[in-house]
Amino acid sequence: MEELQGYLEEDRSRQQQFLYPLLFQEYIYVFAYDHGLNSSIFYEPQNSLGYDNKFSSVLVKRLIIRMYQKNYLIYSVNDIYQNLFVGHNNYFYFNFFSQILSEGFAVIVEIPFSLQLISSLEEKEIPKSHNLQSSHSIFPFLEDKLLHLNYLSDILIPYPVHMEILVQMLQSWIQDVLSLHLLQFLLHEYYNWTSLIIPKKSIYVFSKENKRLFWFLYNLYIYEYEFLLVFPCKQSSFLRLISSGVLLERIHFYVKIEHLGVCRIFCQKTLWIFKDPFIHYIRYQGKSILGSRGTHFLMKKWKYHLVNFWQYYFHFWSQPYRIDIKKLSNYSFYFLGYFSSVQINSSMVRNQMLENSFLMDTLTKKFDTIIPIIPLIRSLSKAQFCTVSGYPISKPIWTDLADCDIINRFGRICRKLSHYHSGSSKKQSLYRMKYILRLSCARTLARKHKSSARSFLQRLSSGLLEEFFTEEEQVIFLIFPKIIYFYLYVSYRERIWYLDIIRINDLVNCLLVTT
């Protein structure tokens, strides 16, 4: 226990005291704007407030001047509560006011964590570390390692229900008491105000408002959880943690751990539960995968250890059903938009020794990835490219655009989806997706020109659309040649993993969260 706390305190000691006065300087918000915070609420249209999609530095400066006035924040909030049923202008004003503060707070607290990430990459001297940021960089690792594992635990990572738990974790990292009080005030007032407008059951911890702040708190929770879970690997001289280090949701990574011992930190003394000689841990967004060569009983020990770990350290209960243990040979798991599985192929080989001949049954394992067609069709239907049964339809909202813009939009979506799903071993779903988008584009153009899709394609020729839908940019990729069958014919298939997929467009992201 003392050893664990020592490692934790040593890691936290690198953090410097945050400067609370920075929050009241308008250049901090300009700094945030210049660095392209695309997830910020200020880049979304504020029609209700009468502002454009770029937040105004002059407006921020005026609000900061008002914040300097004594008790202005408290008076403004009380005034909003008193005039709740008079109109909604006060709500939007308070909403915008709280977003300004939360955005500035998130920018300031991210600075030292970002510096720690840069220094961590420089210390480890990881060659081409930017390639590890691609979500496709996980799949070559899976293809190499899962063939040797027996069981897999599909873990849905829980998150604290109460925000005070996240604030307490942040308190152990920073020394600025004023910033912590401000954060508690923002969370408390935001929760109370939102509960007056909508039912509490509709409140989600990662709401669209204050998204940057909530993502930072969630990243801090994930960092704390994974540091305490896998910290023994840092003691090894030849095995190093390969990850982003901090702000984990922004970089997709994998972790290799061997000879890992897990410590039950809620005990008075160090208690080693087990030592797994071969275990792998992978996480993306709110899900993680724990693979092991051990037995089913060993994986159950991992499961109950994680449940107790969340209960005693983070003080909230996690349901055991959130951790699903499956035998890898009989299980396909959904991960990053793919259904992945380990297939066992059997082949008969005839051996002959002198005058005797006999048949040998040879078993080979293969990592297989396929595209789930149902979530794909559901996402295309939600975006109004086809019906729920997969029948292509026109996109009426795009008929006001120029023909070249319509073709470019459809082609861009098709290329990006094809780009991301290029790692599939079976291309039928990919070809069906291209067919739906191509015919939807033709129907949209035909609707604009008041013609039929068939006559439009005959007049325009299908070669023009095919040229747009097959154009591909030059990017870094990995090619893995696939199976050679021992028959009269040879079938060659390749799986391509691109190392440039850092951010995923909305349609692909919709596929990733669909279950």
Swiss-Prot record:
Q: Which UniProt keywords apply?
A: Chloroplast, mRNA processing, Plastid, RNA-binding, tRNA processing
Its biological purpose is as follows: Usually encoded in the trnK tRNA gene intron. Probably assists in splicing its own and other chloroplast group II introns.
Q: Which GO terms describe its cellular component?
A: chloroplast
InterPro entries cross-referenced by the UniProt entry: Domain_X, Maturase_MatK, Maturase_MatK_N
Q: Which residues cross the membrane?
A: none
Q: Where in the cell is it found?
A: Plastid, Chloroplast
Q: Which GO terms describe its molecular function?
A: RNA binding
Q: Please provide the Gene Ontology terms (biological process) for this protein.
A: mRNA processing; RNA splicing; tRNA processing
The entry's family comment says: Belongs to the intron maturase 2 family. MatK subfamily.
What's the protein name? Maturase K
- The species this protein was found in: Curcuma longa (Turmeric)
The leader peptide range reads none
